[in-house]
Amino acid sequence: MNNNLFSKLLLWLLLITLPVTVFSQSTEFTIQDVKFESQGVTLAGSIIKPENPFAAVVFVHGSDPVKREMALAKRLAKEGIAVLTYDKRGVGESGGVYVGPSVGTNNIDSTNLNLLSNDANEAVKTLQTYLKNKKIPIGLIGVSQAGWIIPITANKNPQIEFMVLFSCPTITTLEQLRFQFYTNGNNNFWENHTDADAIEHTKNDPDKYQFEATDPKNYLSTLSIPGLWLFGEKDIQIPVKLCIEQLNKFKVKGKPFEYTLFSALGHNTVFDNDTTPFDISIQWIKQKTLNLKKTKSSK
């Protein structure tokens, strides 16, 4: 079945099976600027909050030096989800130092990824203090580099109850760099290469950098919270088929991990003009948070 057709069918099934009246939400929301401490520096962000949120999320950045993602946060708030989004460490109004470049040793070495996970964890704690209803599920949503940061963060904080990962790797940092150097930014890469070829190079090419690799599987293996990965098949930043291969191994073991593949999309699945990935993520969050609430009420 065509992957895009499958994605739209999945969205339709979610829509007809979900009791949407539970999540009726006006488009009104408030925006409140906040500051919080993390590892000795002050980070600045904004909380975008609808009147009666059914869930809350912290947005976790990709590797670039980016400020808070207000446009995405507003889209989430209009769907009934409270969001804390902040300027990345060393960017905008946030203190500290941005560790760059975005492609290179120090940006994705274990020290920096752990530091960024501490920032995300402190953001979760901060967001919780601004929620009137302390019982609503809180999760993490992120892009690209967040594929390493989110599992680390979720391991640090048992109050994180779900995760949504757009174009995020499930392979090691060194493997991702091998693939990225192999594709070399060529948007036509997949016209002349196969998945088998890409996987072979990702697993066996010599490393241009030498540092301790971070393997998200070490953290995902200890998690029992639901997770959704959304991939673009034309991605030239991460080897999607290899990432899916890793997720399938977790699924066989009973992990509550799901993924959706979009044949026409590349790396920026959440920011693409095609809103299907975003729409599917919203319906998934609604379904999972409803399940979480049922589980809590039955205890």
List each language-model region with its residue ranges.
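N-terminal cap/lid segment of alpha/beta-hydrolase-fold proteins
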Residues: Q25-E51
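Short beta-strand element of the alpha/beta-hydrolase
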Residues: F54-G62
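Short alpha-helix in the alpha/beta-hydrolase fold that links the catalytic acid
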Residues: L72, I225, P239-K249
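Conserved alpha/beta-hydrolase
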Residues: L76-G100
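Alpha/beta-hydrolase active-site loop
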Residues: N106-Y130
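Hydrolase active-site cap/lid region
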Residues: K156-E200
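Short beta-strand/loop motif that positions the catalytic acidic residue
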Residues: L223, W229-F231, D235
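Catalytic active-site module of serine/aspartate enzymes centered on a nucleophile-bearing elbow/loop
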Residues: L265-K299
